[in-house]
Amino acid sequence: MKHILFTLKSCPYGLLDDEAHTRNVLVHAAHLCKSTLLGLSSHKFDPQGVTAVALLAESHISIHTWPEEGMAVCDVFTCGDHTIPEAGVQYMYEMFGATDMVSQEFVRPLR
C-alpha cells in the first residue's frame, strides 16, 4: 500500500476553482493509477475552492484547493501490486499547472 501526500503550488486560480475540471482530473488520475473508480464526490465553495474525493476499490484520491493561495493539498492512497499512484500524482501536477510540489510517500505495511 502506498500513500502519497502532496501539495501543488503556484497553480492558476481558474484551474483550482473549477469543480468540473477537478472532477475530470480525479477520474483520469484514477485510471492512470490503474485503479477502479467506485464513486466521485465534490463540493464547490463560495467564494472559491473545491474539495473532491474519488473513492477507489483500492482506496482513494482527494484534493482540497485554495485558489486564492494558488495551492492544492492532495493525496493518492492505493493498495495492490497493480497500482501506480505516482502516475496519478504526476498527472494532477500537470493538469493543475503547478510549478512546484512538495510530497511525502508512505509505504503502509499490511501487518
Give residue ranges: language-model regions:
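Polybasic/polar functional segments that serve as interface/processing modules
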Residues: 1-111
